[in-house]
Amino acid sequence: MIQSPTSFLIVLILLWCKLVISCFRECIVALQQLIQVLLQIINSNLQSRLLLWHSLD
């Protein structure tokens, strides 16, 4: 079964697109986790500051 160069190129491009999409998806998941961690840190900082302000009053 000999394929023409154009169909081979199309298969290569499709595989490359699949790879890019999967990498992109993993990057998005990693970014979401990073954002959640940052939000948790910010929340804990805000809560501790609020507690400090209340204790000063």
From Swiss-Prot:
An example GO biological process term is: symbiont-mediated suppression of host innate immune response
Q: Where is the signal peptide?
A: 1-23
List the keywords (alphabetical): Host-virus interaction, Inhibition of host innate immune response by virus, Interferon antiviral system evasion, Signal, Viral immunoevasion
Query: Would you say which domain of life the source belongs to?
Result: Viruses
**Keyword Signal tagged:** yes
**Protein's UniProt keywords contain Signal:** yes
> Which residues are connected by disulfide bridges in this protein?
none
Q: What does this protein do?
A: Involved in resistance to IFN.
| Name the record gives this protein | Non-structural protein 3a
> Species name for this entry?
Avian infectious bronchitis virus (strain UK/183/66)
